Amino acid sequence: MIMNIAFIGMACALGLSAMGSAFGSGFAAQASVGAWKKCYANGKPAPFIMVAFSGAPLTQTIYGFLLMNFIRSAVEGGCDAMLAMFTGIFAGLAIGLSAFFQGKVAAASADALGETGKGTANYFIVIGIIETVALFTLVFSLLLLQ
């Protein structure tokens, strides 16, 4: 029974993170395609770097996978299963929301870059700031599970 509760946390850590990545990447990819279309329609070069905008939210799935495995190891090492479950649920949600909103910012970045051709470094900086939330969540969750 104890491990079954922990399985909920493991599933949420990965599942919620991956759902956020799917939504975020979808938003960013749609905007990238739209920006490329505008570039082609106006005879401007289409910046390939927008592929990176589209893929940025995918890293949160990796963080969810890592957290899932850390939860399993923590429970096998004697960590409370309820703590593991709730850590997986709330950390998975935080990581997933980070990916969701990172995708929205990446979508806005693709639109802006497609229209102006400028600001790439600035766009990556703000995308990276949102990534930091997921990294902090992963690290703080690992500390909580020790």
PLM segments and residue spans:
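Hydrophobic, small-residue-rich transmembrane alpha-helices and their short perimembrane loops
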Residues: 1-146
